[in-house]
Amino acid sequence: MKQNNIFFRYFSPVAAQQKLYVAALVALLSSSAYEAEAQVGEPFIHDPSTIAQCDGKYYTFGTGEGGLWSEDGWTWQGGAVRPGRGAAPDVLKIGDRYLVAYSATGGGLGGSHRGDVLTMWNKTLDPKSPDFKYTEPVVVASSLDDEDCDAIDAGLLLDPTTGRLWLSYGTYFGFIRLVELDPKTGKRMEGNEPVNIAIDCEATDLIYRNGWYYLLGTHGTCCDGPNSTYNIVVGRSRKITGPYVDNVGREMLQGGGKMVIAANNLKTGPGHFGRYIEEEGVEKMSFHYESDFRQGGRSVLAIRPLLW
C-alpha cells in the first residue's frame, strides 16, 4: 500500500501543488487551459504520432499518408510525408536518423485482428531535403484473425538508461503488447517474445522518468466524431515490462489506469498521447481530439505543457 500512496500523490489533484505530478490533471480543471491548448492554422489530424523536431521544424504523422508540420510548434499545416498509408504511426529520432513505425491492419472493430506493425528509417523529415528518402519498411509485429491482440497503434521508446528500444502496440479489442527492437536496424530483436502489459486501452505510449516507466493509454471508443468517448489513462512501473499500476493499485493488465485527460464542453475524444522534450526542462504532450466543435467537429491536434 505504501507504493500506491506514493503513486497517488503523483497523480492526485489534491496534492499536486506539493508533489511531482502530471500537469494534465491540473489542466483539465482549468477552462483557460482549453483555450491555450488550441493549435492554429490547419491542425487537422487523426491518431497523431509523437511530435519530432528536425532542422528547426516540428513534424507529426497521422493515420493515412501524410501529416502536419510547423515552424513554431503552434501554427500547423499539412505537408509532412509518410509513405505506406496505414494507421496510427509513431516517430522517434535515434542518433542522426528518424525511425517511423506504422500499422497495416484490420483493427479489430470489424471482427478481424489481422495486421502488421512496420518500421522504416529516414535521415530527415523534411520532404524538400535532398536526403529525404525512406528505407524499405520491415514488419516487426503481427497479429492473426484469431489472435487476442491487434498489431496497430505503435508506440516507441528508447530507454535512456539502457539504450534498448521498445515498441508497444495493440487495441481495446485485446492485449497491449511490448516487444524489443534493435535500435541500429529498427527490426525485431531475434528471439524476442511479446509481453502483455495492459488491456482495455489502445494507442499506448511509454515514458521513462526518474526511475519510473509510465504507460499512457487511450480508453473508450473512437472514430465517431462528437460521440467518441476516448480519454487518456496512465499507470507506472519500475520495470519496462510491468506490471503497470494506477494510483489506487489496479494493474493496467487488469483494466486499471488513472484518467489524466478527458473531454470538455468544446472538444471530445482525447487520445493518442505523445511526449516530447522541447529543450532541457521544457516538456510538452501532444494528442488529438476526435471532435473540436469550434472547428466543424473535425479531429484536431492538441498540445499542452507537461509539468512534473
List each model region and its residues.
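Hydrophobic residues within membrane-embedded alpha helices
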Residues: 10-12, 27, 42
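Bacterial N-terminal signal peptides
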Residues: 19-31
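Glycine-centered signal
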Residues: 13-15, 31-35
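Bacterial N-terminal signal peptides that target proteins for export
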Residues: 3-22
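Secreted/periplasmic carbohydrate-active enzymes, especially glycoside hydrolases
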Residues: 1-2, 35
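Carbohydrate-active catalytic/glycan-binding domains of CAZyme proteins
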Residues: 36-308
